[in-house]
From Swiss-Prot:
Cross-referenced SMART domains: SCY
Protein name: C-C motif chemokine 7
Gene: Ccl7
Localization in the cell: Secreted
Origin species: Mus musculus (Mouse)
Summary of the function given for this chain in its UniProt record: Chemotactic factor that attracts monocytes and eosinophils, but not neutrophils. Augments monocyte anti-tumor activity.
InterPro entries: Chemokine_b/g/d, Chemokine_CC_CS, Chemokine_IL8-like_dom, Interleukin_8-like_sf
Quaternary organization: Monomer. Interacts with TNFAIP6 (via Link domain).
Modified residue annotations for Pyrrolidone carboxylic acid: 24
GO biological process: cellular response to ethanol; cytoskeleton organization; eosinophil chemotaxis; immune response; inflammatory response; positive regulation of natural killer cell chemotaxis; regulation of cell shape; response to gamma radiation
């Protein structure tokens, strides 16, 4: 009986540590963007973007925000992604000092 209690205690401690590891900022979450969309999104539907780099993802990715509020991941080095980024950069006015 004593061995069972000890094993249960060790299991609970291991579970607590694994939860903390997954809760770290570099833990896996939707923003790591490892699941990317290969299909081209029309530029007119895009509102903004942000670049994502993570040690948990093997490639650099971009998250596009559409005019309808959806977020779509895409691989940063695809030609259509680079064109969409250039398009959004041209649309966004640069602030004057």
């Amino acid at each position: 009986m004593r061995i069972s209690a000890t094993l249960l205690c060790l299991l609970l401690i291991a579970a607590a540590f694994s939860i903390q590891v997954w809760a770290q900022p570099d833990g896996p979450n939707a923003s790591t963007c490892c699941y990317v969309k290969k299909q081209k999104i029309p530029k007119r539907n895009l509102k903004s973007y942000r670049r994502i780099t993570s040690s948990r993802c093997p490639w650099e990715a971009v998250i596009f925000k559409t005019k309808k509020g959806m977020e779509v991941c895409a691989e940063a080095h695809q030609k259509w992604v680079e064109e969409a980024i250039a398009y959004l950069d041209m649309k966004t006015p640069t602030p004057k000092p």
